[in-house]
Amino acid sequence: MAGLEVLFASAAPAITCRQDALVCFLHWEVVTHGYFGLGVGDQPGPNDKKSELLPAGWNNNKDLYVLRYEYKDGSRKLLVKAITVESSMILNVLEYGSQQVADLTLNLDDYIDAEHLGDFHRTYKNSEELRSRIVSGIITPIHEQWEKANVSSPHREFPPATAREVDPLRIPPHHPHTSRQPPWCDPLGPFVVGGEDLDPFGPRRGGMIVDPLRSGFPRALIDPSSGLPNRLPPGAVPPGARFDPFGPIGTSPPGPNPDHLPPPGYDDMYL
């Protein structure tokens, strides 16, 4: 039990009861498992510092001891509470990260000789049993639960993105057009209006000009270069441009006769 006697000697002036001696032993056992004491109380304080010694004010309350510890690599932090209940002491340990809890109840008379608190060699009884109970009841359960929590949620690593995913300006590889299907137009498709606007580099399809006389069969297309009073000069309307004709439709079939199905009484001059 190397180190326990030195720790007891440093804390001897403050050890005045059985529970003080037991908390001193508990502190030593926690430190031997790679932890450092930080301070007292539930919350961090301005005077916190890593130390193997008991912090100042560790036994101000003989009924409730509250100590905080941190593992040597900073991966784990413990909150240890020791509660005195008549001749017993209840030990409760919380690991902050995983929120795992372990507790242990010890009979003070089984391990502490209250008549010889000033003599280290006579203060503790059944030291090996006490140490075994602390390790099996607190240290081991906390470590096992912490390791299990880390294994159940491992850190996932994703492979780096390829150049094609991260470079939006990358030029795609060139493929010969030997197997490309020749473009063709579908004169019977009644719902291809605007298709060429959506895919300007694809095969020639319907533009934004809708032929109201289209009934599923090829007909004479509306001349998009029609203007007033004559046709627009060649090249005024680029191929595939968004352009509405603003003049007569020229050679296309005429519109409906305004005298066809006239309204009743249209020729009555007295109406």
Swiss-Prot record:
Feature: compositional bias, Pro residues: 251-265
Omega-N-methylarginine: residues bearing it: R205, R231
Primary residence: cytoplasm
GO molecular function: endopeptidase inhibitor activity; proteasome binding; protein heterodimerization activity; protein homodimerization activity
PTM-bearing positions, type Phosphoserine: S153, S252
Residues recorded with modification Asymmetric dimethylarginine: R219
Stretches for region Disordered: 222-271
This protein's UniProt keywords: Acetylation, Cytoplasm, Endoplasmic reticulum, Methylation, Phosphoprotein, Proteasome
Pfam families: PI31_Prot_C, PI31_Prot_N
Family, similarity comment: Belongs to the proteasome inhibitor PI31 family.
Protein name: Proteasome inhibitor PI31 subunit
Gene label: PSMF1
